[in-house]
C-alpha cells in the first residue's frame, strides 16, 4: 500500500517523514477558495483537507494507496486567517495577533482508495502572542518567513519568538498534528 501526501508544504513533508519512511508527494490542485467559512472552524479545515485528498485521489488512477490531506488555519475572534496575500496583509495579521490568544486548527482527511473509505478529524491548539510593536513586525516581515503560512507566522522559525504560551499540539501549529495522524493511520490498519 502506497502512502501519498496531498500537499506542497515542505513542513508537512518533513513532519510526515518522522512517521513514514517512504511516501509519495502529489500536490493538490484543489481550489481552497471554493470552501466558504461558515462559523465552524473544525468543519472548515476538514472540508479543505478532504478537498485536497479527493483531488489527489482522482489523479491516482488504478493505484492502491492511502492519501493524506491536511489543512491548517488560524482563527482570531471567530474569523479565519489564512495565508497572507502580500506583506501588507501579513503586517495586519500579526498586528491583530499581537497580545492576543488565537486558535490554530488543522483538519486531516485520510482516504483509502481500495476500501473507498475516508476518515476525517481535526486538532485545535490555542496560542497566545506577546505584545509586538510595529518595528518588530516589520523586521520579521523582512525575513520573508511569513509567506505561505496561515496567520503569517511560523512557530518553528523566527516567528516562534512572538509565542508567549501554547496549549495543545505544537506540531499542529507547524502544520501536521503527528499524534492525531498517527492514531488515525493506525486505526486504518497502516503499520507505522
Swiss-Prot record:
CDD domains: Maf (cd00555). One of its GO terms (biological process) is nucleotide metabolic process. It is found in: Cytoplasm. GO terms for cellular component: cytoplasm. The active site is at 71 (proton acceptor). It is an enzyme of class 3 (hydrolase). The record marks 11, 72, 156 as: Important for substrate specificity. Signal peptide: none annotated. NCBIfam families: maf (TIGR00172), PRK00078.1 (NF000867). Belongs to the Maf family. YhdE subfamily. Nucleoside triphosphate pyrophosphatase that hydrolyzes dTTP and UTP. May have a dual role in cell division arrest and in preventing the incorporation of modified nucleotides into cellular nucleic acids. This is dTTP/UTP pyrophosphatase. It comes from Clostridium kluyveri (strain ATCC 8527 / DSM 555 / NBRC 12016 / NCIMB 10680 / K1). The lineage of its organism: Bacteria, Bacillati, Bacillota, Clostridia, Eubacteriales.
Amino acid at each position: 500500500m502506497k502512502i501519498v501526501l496531498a500537499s506542497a508544504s515542505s513542513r508537512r513533508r518533513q513532519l510526515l517523514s518522522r512517521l513514514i519512511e517512504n511516501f509519495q508527494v502529489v500536490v493538490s490542485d484543489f481550489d481552497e477558495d471554493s470552501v466558504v467559512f461558515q462559523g465552524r472552524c473544525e468543519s472548515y479545515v476538514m472540508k479543505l483537507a478532504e478537498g485536497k485528498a479527493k483531488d489527489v485521489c482522482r489523479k491516482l488512477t488504478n493505484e492502491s494507496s492511502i492519501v493524506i490531506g491536511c489543512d491548517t488555519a488560524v482563527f482570531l475572534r471567530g474569523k479565519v486567517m489564512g495565508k497572507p496575500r502580500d506583506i501588507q496583509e501579513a503586517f495586519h495579521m500579526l498586528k491583530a495577533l499581537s497580545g492576543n490568544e488565537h486558535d490554530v486548527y488543522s483538519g486531516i482527511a485520510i482516504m483509502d482508495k481500495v476500501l473507498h473509505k475516508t476518515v476525517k478529524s481535526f486538532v485545535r491548539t490555542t496560542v497566545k502572542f506577546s505584545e509586538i510593536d510595529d518595528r518588530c513586525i516589520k523586521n520579521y516581515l523582512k525575513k520573508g518567513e511569513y509567506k505561505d503560512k496561515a496567520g503569517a507566522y511560523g512557530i518553528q522559525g523566527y516567528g516562534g519568538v512572538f509565542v508567549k504560551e501554547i496549549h495543545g499540539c505544537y506540531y499542529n501549529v507547524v502544520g501536521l498534528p503527528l499524534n492525531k495522524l498517527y492514531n488515525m493511520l493506525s486505526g486504518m490498519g497502516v503499520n507505522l
